[in-house]
């Protein structure tokens, strides 16, 4: 894969892209603003991932030496310039859609830069930032489809799922984070307590998920599909309690990403 594509972490950026498309499907809104919005959040997420890799250069030499910057595929300064250009493009796209969307993109851009520079290494605050940014993609889509309330509801579920997964990723990266004197949740409070918080968040998500059917937001199709996602989240929680090794956390993180994608599919199918 081209390193300039790889550094965007296209899989993660694609999830943001899908979030906006989901709001279009749910709201039965199909116009050029949706296309621009999906592209906007993809680029914004990719630029956030790039600036994050720029500031994480030293940590990634330990945790992820094959990433574009530590592997030497992209020079450090070029990564910075690349991210700033992408940020600018995403902001322009946001304002083309609407003033409100443009403001959201600017706020998210500021948050992503502050997160990468400082907040990521602060206990739990960094996790909250990533989860908030993920949730805001649905709000962003809701602004386009004129259904902000639903955007906030789905954004809340995305927030819970992302927050749990971010804690798992911190446990996976604990070795490199310790060497860089980061103050992540598992470093400050221990791996077991961090796992328990991730598990609790997973359980809360599973318990609340049927409410979207109960309150007639989505159809029975949603309930059938979300059960699959819930099973994956429960299984991930079980694995996390059993084994906190780097390899296990990496596997659990992947399982949870699959669970999130299935949950997103349930949103779309439940609205048809």
UniProtKB/Swiss-Prot annotation:
It catalyses: sn-3-O-(geranylgeranyl)glycerol 1-phosphate + (2E,6E,10E)-geranylgeranyl diphosphate = 2,3-bis-O-(geranylgeranyl)-sn-glycerol 1-phosphate + diphosphate. InterPro entries: DGGGP_synth, Prenyltransferase_related, UbiA_prenyltransferase, UbiA_sf. Its cofactor is Mg(2+). The chain crosses the membrane at residues 16-36, 79-99, 100-120, 124-144, 148-168, 194-214, 217-237, 252-272. GO terms for biological process: glycerophospholipid biosynthetic process. It comes from the Archaea. GO terms for molecular function: geranylgeranylglycerol-phosphate geranylgeranyltransferase activity; magnesium ion binding. Its EC number is 2.5.1.42. PANTHER family: CHLOROPHYLL SYNTHASE (PTHR42723), CHLOROPHYLL SYNTHASE, CHLOROPLASTIC (PTHR42723:SF1). This is Digeranylgeranylglyceryl phosphate synthase.
